[in-house]
């Protein structure tokens, strides 16, 4: 019996097809092992007044190290944004919509600017509380919209609150007792709204007030604040990232 001869051209073609299949398999494996985080919100996740890496990027880097998987962050937060602005982003901004659709975790920190301190209201809490119903509605709508955009795959919504929605630590104390009391009351209201939104929607919740001020909210958080007293410094962003990483890793099972 004569040995079967292989046509050189066919042999080369078969090799190229095999090589292509291997490349596709490798690409699929790489894509499957990578994860993505998208951050939405105001100047805190944006990293204002801190020449440092903001917490969304830090949390992605920390998760990459702890899990051995590639985790990348896209930071779509904008300084000055309110909950109304974030909701508009999720409805009208095609880039943000595409980012969220592909995300495995969406970090959202918003609400402080909805009740931002102003001279006309001063420390009169009742002057700010009329803004709370709209904030609560927007938080629910934001989470609902994110869940709609990520309906095709497993994704985790992470809601973060605030250590103070106004100035914090020694910066708040410098404005007097009435300012400190009003800041604490408004922070209570905003943080409660965020915590309830997380509970009602099944989202993850990160208690930054506890992270910065301890379990009883009694510690002075000044050492976590930048020079404006309103935003985190590098240590503050790392503290937020550590708290957020723990929640994401547990809820998504990235370990």
Region annotations inferred by a language model:
Residues 60, 64-68, 91, 95, ...:
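Sec-exported extracytoplasmic/periplasmic mature domains
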Residues 43-46, 78-84, 111-117, 163-168, ...:
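Solvent-exposed loop/turn segments at secondary-structure junctions
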Residues 28-79:
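Serine-esterase "nucleophile elbow" of acetyl-processing enzymes
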Residues 163-255:
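Catalytic His-Asp segment of secreted/periplasmic serine-dependent ester chemistry enzymes
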Residues 26-33, 86-104, 141-151:
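Short amphipathic alpha-helices and their capping/turn segments at secondary-structure boundaries
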Residues 2-31:
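Secretory targeting and sorting signals
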Residues 88-133:
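Oxyanion-hole/transition-state-stabilizing segment in secreted/luminal serine hydrolases
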Residues 36-41, 45, 72-77, 104-109, ...:
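Structural recognition of the beta-strand scaffold that forms the well-ordered cores
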């Amino acid at each position: 019996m004569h040995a079967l001869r292989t046509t050189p051209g066919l042999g080369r073609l078969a090799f190229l097809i095999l090589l292509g299949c291997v490349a596709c398999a490798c690409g699929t494996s790489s894509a499957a092992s990578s994860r993505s985080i998208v951050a939405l919100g105001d100047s805190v996740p944006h990293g204002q007044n801190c020449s440092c890496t903001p917490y969304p990027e830090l949390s992605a880097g920390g998760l990459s190290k702890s899990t051995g998987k590639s985790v990348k962050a896209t930071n779509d937060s904008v300084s000055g944004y309110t909950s109304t602005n974030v909701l508009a982003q999720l409805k009208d901004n095609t880039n943000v919509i595409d980012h969220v659709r592909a995300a495995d975790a969406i970090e959202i920190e918003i609400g402080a600017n909805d009740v931002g301190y102003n001279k006309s209201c001063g420390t009169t809490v009742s002057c700010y509380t009329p803004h709370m119903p709209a904030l609560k509605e927007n938080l629910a709508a934001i989470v609902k919209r994110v869940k709609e955009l990520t309906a095709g795959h497993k994704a985790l919504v992470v809601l973060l609150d605030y250590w103070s929605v106004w100035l914090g630590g020694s910066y708040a104390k410098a404005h007097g007792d009435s300012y400190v009391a009003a800041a604490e009351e408004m922070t209570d209201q905003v943080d409660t709204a965020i915590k309830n939104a997380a509970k009602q929607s099944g989202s993850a919740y990160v208690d930054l007030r506890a992270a910065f001020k301890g379990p009883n909210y009694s510690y002075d958080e000044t050492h976590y604040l930048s020079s404006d007293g309103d935003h985190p410094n590098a240590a503050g962003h790392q503290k937020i990232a550590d708290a957020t990483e723990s929640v994401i890793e547990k809820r998504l099972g990235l370990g």
